[in-house]
Amino acid sequence: MKDYNVQRWAFWALAAAFVVDFLGYAFIVPILPSWKAQFALSNTEATALVSFWAVPLFIFGPKTGRITDRFGAGKTILASLFLLTISALLYLVATMDLPIDGFYVLALARLIHGASGAAILTAGFAAASQIWPTRFGEMSGKLIAMATIGGLLGPVIGGISYEIDPNLSFILLAILTAGVIPLIYVTTNDLGKGDEPVQGGVPISVFINNPVLFRIGLLVMMTTLATGALEAGVPLFLGEELGLNSGWIGAIILVMVLAQGAGGWLWGTLVDKNGPVRYMIIGWSLVTISLISAGIVAWKITDSVTAAYYIIVILGVFQFAIAAAQVPMLPMVDTATSQAYGKGGAGLAFGAFGTAWAAGTIIGPLIIGPVYDYTNSWAVALGILAVPMAIGLLITLRNKEMLSDCYTSEMANRVSE
């Protein structure tokens, strides 16, 4: 019973950290058009603010992994929550009258948020892989679902509170983030005390030289490329092209994040039961079709209400399906690292995973914004995202036996232990 209670509290502590992490990430989505007008930003600059969140994750992903392995997931997450709180208050500072351009303060806030968010992701997944070694697919799927809840609440809370009082909104974000600190504090030891990795640290070159991990990294990057691009571009498309108000925009974003949350919960459980590859193939196929469909809707349908209904369905399918492509890769990177290099470097493994995740999150918004600025066509900007999705499908199909063998053999070893 004690172990069950420890695991239960550990899950809810990790879940709360993931919620506030992604709540802050998505908090600015409905505010982005206001910032664009306030700071006279181009579409490229506005979408770049979304990308900035992922820059520290890309650069410092492996470093946060080493920190996690050395000091423990609990302490790493605890320190990161303090930084998240500071970054929330920096958003408030950016909107004040300053001697410098507020855009640079916004960028700094996003970078700090990204650095602390990177550590939470790395430490959280590393802790989950150690606490639930044979149920990691299920638990990582649930954690992604909880992160999605944060992504759901972020635009809603951010949009409503910003409309009431712009200053109040960022104070509220800081309070919500700081509120998780006590829960992480009391579960710090349960999440992992930390120690030197058994192998002395998995060299980062492994994630390039190992064929399984390299392919997983490419696939991770492609999934987050699409989601990052849509998170940045969809609010601008709905507002500028279709003329929808904040209520419609919020409703469509609501469907997107609910669909991904449901998908993350479902696919993670199915992966533990049946293996990952079949669900990855389903996911890649559906996301490719949905993005082509989104481009066609943006091109053909001019009535804003009709287009909005189509977009709700299409992007709901996309978000549900992207979870099928994305969630299985979490247990796969865990098992592939353990199989090739032994145990002891879970933090570094997920830090490198985070680097691939961040690469796509950075590239995505920097594709959709400039493509639209250059072509002045949302049909092209949305439809072009189907290309990397189709490539992801081809990579999965060509390497399905390698990916499946890696996963099934390692999980068999864990069950026998």
Question: Where do the model's predicted regions map?
Answer:
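Juxtamembrane intracellular "pre-TM" segments in multi-pass secondary transporters
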Residues: M1-N5, N189-G217, R414-E417
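Short amphipathic helix-loop junctions that connect adjacent transmembrane helices
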Residues: P30-T44, A232-G247, T335-S338
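Central cavity-lining transmembrane alpha-helices of secondary-active solute carriers
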Residues: S51-G65, L254-L266
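Conserved MFS/SLC helix-loop-helix module at the cytosolic interface between two early adjacent transmembrane helices
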Residues: I59-L98
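Cytoplasmic membrane-interface "Motif A"-like loop-to-helix N-cap segments
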Residues: R70-L81, K273-V287
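C-terminal ends and interior cores of transmembrane alpha-helices
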Residues: F82-P99, L286-S304
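Cytoplasmic helix-loop-helix junction between adjacent transmembrane helices
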Residues: A109-A147
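Helix-loop-helix hairpin linking two adjacent transmembrane segments in secondary transporters
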Residues: L143-T188
